[in-house]
Structure formats: C-alpha cells, structure tokens
Amino acid sequence: MKQALAQKARIPLYRNPAMRGIAAQLAVLAIVVWALVTIFNNTVANLRVRGIQTGFDFMDQVAPFAIGFSPFIEYKLGESPYWLVFLIGIQNTIIVSILGIIAATIIGFTVGVMRLSPNFFLSRFALLYIETFRNIPVLLQIMFWNFAVFLPLLPFPQQSLGAGWGLFLNNRGLYLPKPVPAEGVGIWALLAAFIIGIVAIVVLSRWARRRQYLTGRRPPGVLYGLLVMAGLVALAFLMFDAPLRFERPELGRFNLSGGIQVPLPLFSLWFALSTYTASFIAENVRGGIASVSRGQTEASQSLGLSRAKMLRLVVIPQALRVIIPPTINQYLNLTKNSSLAVAVAYEELVSLWAGIALNQTGQALVIIAMTIVVYETLSLITSAILNIYNKRVQLVER
C-alpha cells in the first residue's frame, strides 16, 4: 500500500492530466494574446506610416453636422462635441431596441398561442404569419415597410391623419403631445404619486397572489393598484393646479410644429424589427407550450378551468422555463439588427457614430472599437437581466 502511494506521488508533472490541461489552456491564451498584440502593433504602425493620428482627442471637437432626432439629449449644431454624438447614437439605439422588444414579445406570445388554437383559421393565420416573416431577410423587410408601404401611402403633412388629442400621422412620422412640466414642487409631487402608484400595484398584485393560494380566488390586485395610482395622480393635479401640461402639435403652412415627433424611419424600423423578431418568439412560445405535459392540461380541464385560465395559471408558467432561453437570443438579435437602420436613415449608433462621425474624423480604429464595445455591453446587460428572471421561473426540485 505504501509502495503504491509512493509510486503515485512520483508521477511526473507532464503525465498528470490536470497539469496537461492547465498547460494547454495557458498555451492557447498565450497564442491569443500574441495575436492580438501583433494585430494592434501592425495597425498602429500602418497608421503611423500613412500619417494618421489615432486617439480620443477628437471626442472634444465640435461636430459639424445636424442631428434630426434626439428626444432626451439636447444637441446644437456648431456647439456640441463628438462625445455627445456618441451618446445620442447609444440613446437612439436603446430606444428602438426597447420598443422593439416590448412589441415583439406581445406579438410573439399572441401568435404563438394562436398557433396552437383549436380554431382552424386562427392557427393557419399564425402559421402563415410565422412562415412569411421569418423567411424574408430583415433588411428587405425594413426597406419594404419604409419605402414601399409607409412613405408612399401616408399623406403629406398638409393632409395629416388626425386621431384627436393632438395625434397626427403623415409621411414624415407620428406626432404626439409633448409633456411639459411646470415649475415648482408640483411636478415632484406628481412624480411621487406615480412612483407610489407603481409600488401599490406591486404590493397589491402580491397580496392578490397570496389570497389566491389561500382561498382559490384571485382579487383584481392590479386593478386596485391602477385605481390607487389614478387617484393619487388626480389628487396631485388638483392640489398643485396641473403641474404637467401637454404641448400639442400644430399644423403650419408646410409642416407640423411642437409636440414630439417620432420620425418615419424609426417607425418603419420598429415595425419591421418587431414583426420579424415576433415570428421567432412565436415559435419559441409554441414549443414551450407543447413541452408541458398533456396531463397538466387534462387535469386543468377536469377542474373546470377555461382555456384562458388554463394557459395563464397552469401551462404558461411551466412553459416559461423553455420559452425564455431562446427568447433571450432573439432579444439580442433585435438589438444587433437595429444597426440596419442606416438603410432608412434612422440616426442610431452605426448611422451616426460609425457612419457620419467616422467619415468626418477618419478615426476608424477608435470609432469601430467603441461601437463594438457598446453592442457587447448592451448584449451582456440584456442577457444578465433576463437570466436573473429565467432563474426565478425555473422549476425547483426537492
């Protein structure tokens, strides 16, 4: 026994499987680092030979071009620097990504449930939608909706379609009332009322869930929370004499002025990305629902649950563990596909920063590297948030 242990202790390091694995990983890491350093040195040397100076000094220079859409960051032609252009590009990318994710999720879940509907026409319509939208390149869809549908079919600003309450739609975009806060403490009271209302919705929805576990009946907790929010907001308006007013768009001689303009390229891009991504999410939903044991649906039907309650209370909660992982990938694809906005002149990160700013400054290495880092960061943040939610909906086994 002692001889066997002594012989095992004398095994050379090069024959130890663990040490060989570590050595192989270190060798691969060294090769990757060497390749990256070589590429960087060659790039810097080639730029130096051509007299091109690279660095971040250009970020403080004034950008000599106009930006048409920046809802949250103020940009002034001839005054704003390039770093502000970079932030506006990130802002516009995040806007279309968030709007697209919300719309694609709603459409995808709806179509996915319709795909399994016993109604022949609903299920066939869902199948036609999925097979049509997911088999056409997304760039072609973006250009189709913008140049072949919305741009020629929507009227000119003088004949704008109005829906009341200051809503107008024409071939330049969608115009909405703009909220303008009043000075003083009233706007802060209104904001506090809104936040308290959100907290009330969360608290009352959890209370309703606990009541359902105890009694079998679920009170309308979300509705109660919405009523609390509406009451608090109305109270703030009455006490502080309308701390928030809305500036409506007004039709001038040639165009609309005032309010908020959602440019047509943004609307076209959002519509195309939402409908395209929703076709893949619908298949994820269909597969997730199909993965739930048939015995679960039969047990729900035996308890007298309607199809809507069966889906909401039994099937979909179990299907989420299958639906969410591939859906995360579709959210990431939607964010990256937003870079195709340059085809319809929407001013997002690639169009503004990796397009106009790059052509003006010539700092290709720095600008492209920053663009890559932004998309990588957005993808990691999206994945992290959804992975946290995915862990919460996983089945807990004993």
Ranges and model annotations:
Residues 2-398:
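Transmembrane alpha-helices and adjacent helix-loop boundaries
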